[in-house]
From Swiss-Prot:
The keyword DNA-binding applies. This is DNA-binding protein PYRAB09250. Keywords: DNA-binding. Gene3D superfamilies: PDCD5-like. Belongs to the PDCD5 family. It comes from Pyrococcus abyssi (strain GE5 / Orsay). One of its GO terms (molecular function) is DNA binding. It holds the Pfam family dsDNA_bind. InterPro entries: DNA_bind_arc (IPR022889), PDCD5-like (IPR002836), PDCD5-like_sf (IPR036883). The keyword DNA-binding applies. PANTHER family: PROGRAMMED CELL DEATH PROTEIN 5. SUPFAM superfamilies: Double-stranded DNA-binding domain. One of its GO terms (cellular component) is cytosol.
Amino acid sequence: MREVAEDIEEIRRRKLLELQRKYLEQQKAQEEEARQQALIEAQIQAILRKILTPEARERLARVRLVRPELARQVELILVQLYQAGQITERIDDAKLKKILAQIEARTRREFRIKW
């Protein structure tokens, strides 16, 4: 009887150690992913500081408050264009307005209700 109790206790101890190990591995993976996301975000922001005037960055920040998905889409498009060498001069507020309008027009959906 005592051996059975010891065996059960040993199984519980092993299971607990395995769960703790898995938890620590998962936590490390999440921390690494968060670190990589932060690095990518820092790179995106550095590129945006290079290509946008302060007024344009301010406008994009305001758009991010209202429409975060649109702001993210614009950021990624601008970064891609910059990396492809298609942006040769800084983008001011007026140019950013045009870009926002073009992207908004492309992604806007019309809903019609038929009676």
